[in-house]
């Protein structure tokens, strides 16, 4: 088994695979007007996903994260998870979801082979959550998290986008929340995309502000593993949970890049904010194209840039995060 590496010595054991661009939320930082259907989109089907995952696994990838849009909107998600989990070499199957369907569907995903769960949870306060997401669904999400614990899922993470003036005063509440819960909360610095320039200027908060508050409250940064991603992890001896900071505008953010992305329509994206996508779908129709698919992936990886260009105001092809799943 080979190992995917780029020209800057970074290795890539991790694929983020979008299953759909559709989403049932209207998050103010992503899709404030809701998902707008463009014609009749045809997203990757199970047989195409199987060929795609087998190829990346053959190149050394061991972790697949299923994203959206909102991946739980796929009626065939149980089958997709089982297909991904069955691929030789895949050891971890994760999903990022808004969590509203967890109470109904999580047991099926778990039986199919799901090993890790990320839930978007931008506020612990119900009214604020409704304001940010456009939906009053926090109770269902909390019920789903309790179910995930009961099922024994070994990795449960919560994602919260930092929003100045909307949720930036909740850190003490989050600390209290993590005192007895073994979750990892990821605070994500708001990123500029093609559709959110005015929103970004109004609500962007540098992650350094949160890091300073964590250190002042007695939290300590944990050593970063050699194969870790870009998150900086913090722990506290009096808390079961941990806090991660994802700061795309930090100087060394891209040094820790360890993931590639494939869109719901089958385009390989070397970077969340890249200027181009590489069509893989034509090589996902037949098993006989496996070697050609491997060659296309490895060749294109040689074109991956050292950084994302956000400091220069570049947002690439990404109109909003729902289009590629973050």
From Swiss-Prot:
GO biological process: Mo-molybdopterin cofactor biosynthetic process
Positions of [4Fe-4S] cluster 1 binding: 23, 27, 30
InterPro entries (alphabetical): Aldolase_TIM, Elp3/MiaA/NifB-like_rSAM, MoaA, MoaA_NifB_PqqE_Fe-S-bd_CS, MoaA_twitch, MoCo_biosynth_MoaA/MoaC, rSAM
Function (record text): Catalyzes the cyclization of GTP to (8S)-3',8-cyclo-7,8-dihydroguanosine 5'-triphosphate.
Annotated family: Belongs to the radical SAM superfamily. MoaA family.
Principal EC category: lyase
Pathway(s) this gene product operates in, as recorded in its UniProt entry: Cofactor biosynthesis; molybdopterin biosynthesis
Protein's name in the database: GTP 3',8-cyclase
Catalytic reaction equation(s): GTP + AH2 + S-adenosyl-L-methionine = (8S)-3',8-cyclo-7,8-dihydroguanosine 5'-triphosphate + 5'-deoxyadenosine + L-methionine + A + H(+)
Record-listed E.C. numbers: 4.1.99.22
Gene Ontology MF, one: 4 iron, 4 sulfur cluster binding
Binding residues annotated for S-adenosyl-L-methionine, in chain numbering: 29, 69, 120, 191
Biological classification of the source: Bacteria, Pseudomonadati, Pseudomonadota, Gammaproteobacteria, Lysobacterales
HAMAP family, alphabetized: MoaA_B (MF_01225_B)
Keywords assigned by UniProt, alphabetized: 4Fe-4S, GTP-binding, Iron, Iron-sulfur, Lyase, Metal-binding, Molybdenum cofactor biosynthesis, Nucleotide-binding, S-adenosyl-L-methionine
NCBIfam families membership: moaA
Keyword 4Fe-4S assigned: yes
Cofactors (names): [4Fe-4S] cluster
Sequence positions that bind GTP: 16, 65, 96, 157, 259-261
